[in-house]
Amino acid sequence: MQTLLLVDDEPNIVEGLASQFEGRYGGDVIVLKSFSGLHALSILQNNKVDVVLSDIRMPDMDGLTLQRETEALWPHIHFVFLSGFDDFQFIHQASKSPLYHGYLLKMEGDEVVLNKIDQEIAQCAAEARAELEQGEMQRRYARMQGFLQRAALEGFVRGGGSWQQIQHSLPNLAMTL
């Protein structure tokens, strides 16, 4: 299950988007809301969030500062910025971060925002699946390696192979003598 954090100092924007995302995703995505950058940072310090959709200009902490503060907490989070201003200097600064995943203008409309967040949620879900699969492969490899080590030792004890063959096999089995 993915988590989306909406951050904007305009409550009507946050509430409107939250309503649309909750209707769109049902219970498949947790939607968190914040009306300030500082409050959003507090949420991020206490919750695993996959995607942040944040305004740029907010009174207590701007979106760029929020992104920078979040980088140490969650290095794989996806940040998408939403603004009423076409600020190329800001876009340039924000895009330097590995967390940056896009910049949308509020005037582009809800459908553009919804589609972009759909893409980010799908990408986060794919990344989570890949991480689980990698973990499962590592567990299987560890189990298999133990089996191979036992089999090799049994073969060595029974006289199966020359000393040179044994020495050559040990590094591949993560073993030393």
Where would I find each of the regions flagged by the language model?
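Active-site residues of response regulator receiver
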Residues: 8, 55
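Two-component/phosphorelay signaling modules centered on CheY-like receiver
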Residues: 11-32
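Helix N-cap/capping motif at the beta->alpha junctions
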Residues: 18, 33-42, 63-65
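Short hydrophobic/Thr-rich beta-strand motif most characteristic of the beta2 strand and flanking loop
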Residues: 25-35, 43, 91
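Receiver (REC) domain active-site loop signature in two-component systems and cognate sites
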Residues: 58
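Alpha4 helix (beta4-alpha4-beta5 surface) of REC/receiver domains from two-component response regulators
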Residues: 65, 86-103
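Interdomain helical linkers/hinges and coiled-coil/dimerization scaffolds
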Residues: 95-96, 102, 108-177
